[in-house]
UniProtKB/Swiss-Prot annotation:
The keyword GTP-binding does not apply. CDD domains: IHF_B. The gene is ihfB. This is Integration host factor subunit beta. HAMAP family: IHF_beta (MF_00381).
Length: 94
């Protein structure tokens, strides 16, 4: 599902909020999440999951095209840990 599909699904719920307002609220929420993560803050949405940054130390990698070794710098990467409710629902249709 892409953002526009998410906005449409929310609008279909007949909650008397315009599509533009739904889109604006969702974009604003995502922007604040990005800013919080960029500032090193953890985000927790109960039942859904949590977002945080994980540290990756520098290491020697390999360019898959050429096979040559390359140095990969240290960095932080976004990490998502699903909450219990999300994990349980994901396994309902097994």
């Amino acid at each position: 599902m892409i953002k526009s599909e998410l906005f449409e699904r929310i609008a279909e719920q007949k909650i008397n909020i315009s599509n533009k307002m739904i889109e604006r609220a969702a974009k604003e929420m995502l922007e604040h999440m990005i800013i919080s993560l960029a500032n090193g803050k953890r985000i927790e949405i109960r039942g859904f999951g949590s977002f945080s940054l994980h540290y990756r130390s520098s290491r020697i990698g390999r360019n898959p095209k050429t096979g040559k070794s390359v140095k990969l710098n240290e960095k932080y990467v976004p990490y998502f840990k699903p909450g219990k409710k999300l994990r349980d629902r994901a396994n309902i249709h097994k």
